[in-house]
């Protein structure tokens, strides 16, 4: 079942509003980097499996394009390769099991390359990178 659900309670998407709905949820859900979702990133909530929104990550990267075009385009292209795998899976009408196999075979290596590149930059303390580039990379790190 595919569902998009935005939770606002009394105009808030704060901790209480989110917990009211997601504590009973079983499965995967995708979020932005809003801190209240981080409660589901630990062993306390084994049935709620949070993943990060690649569109949000890509948006931060696009914001940094003018600072370090070649570097940022490398990350954007890698994210695009992940999107292409999802598109292909959808186009072929793959089952959940087939999609998982595709992700393990094709998407996992892409994520490995992204992580390696990111960690290399982090070891150098993001030296000589602009403010927006560092912001994009830190957002990505926090969502990893």
Model-derived regions, located:
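Catalytic center-proximal scaffold of phosphoryl-transfer enzymes
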Residues: 1-144
């Amino acid at each position: 079942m595919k569902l998009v659900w935005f939770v606002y309670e009394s105009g808030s998407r704060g901790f209480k509003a989110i917990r009211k709905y997601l504590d009973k949820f079983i499965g995967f859900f995708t979020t932005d980097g809003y801190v209240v979702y981080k409660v589901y990133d630990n062993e306390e909530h084994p049935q709620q499996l949070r993943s990060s929104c690649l569109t949000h990550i890509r948006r931060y990267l696009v914001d940094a394009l003018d600072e370090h075009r070649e570097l940022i385009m490398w990350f954007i292209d890698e994210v695009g390769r992940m999107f292409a795998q999802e598109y292909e899976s959808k186009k072929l009408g793959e089952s959940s099991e087939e999609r998982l196999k595709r992700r393990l075979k094709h998407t996992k290596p892409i994520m490995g390359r992204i992580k390696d590149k990111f960690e290399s930059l982090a070891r150098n303390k993001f030296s000589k990178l602009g403010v927006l580039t560092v912001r994009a990379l830190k957002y990505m790190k926090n969502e990893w």
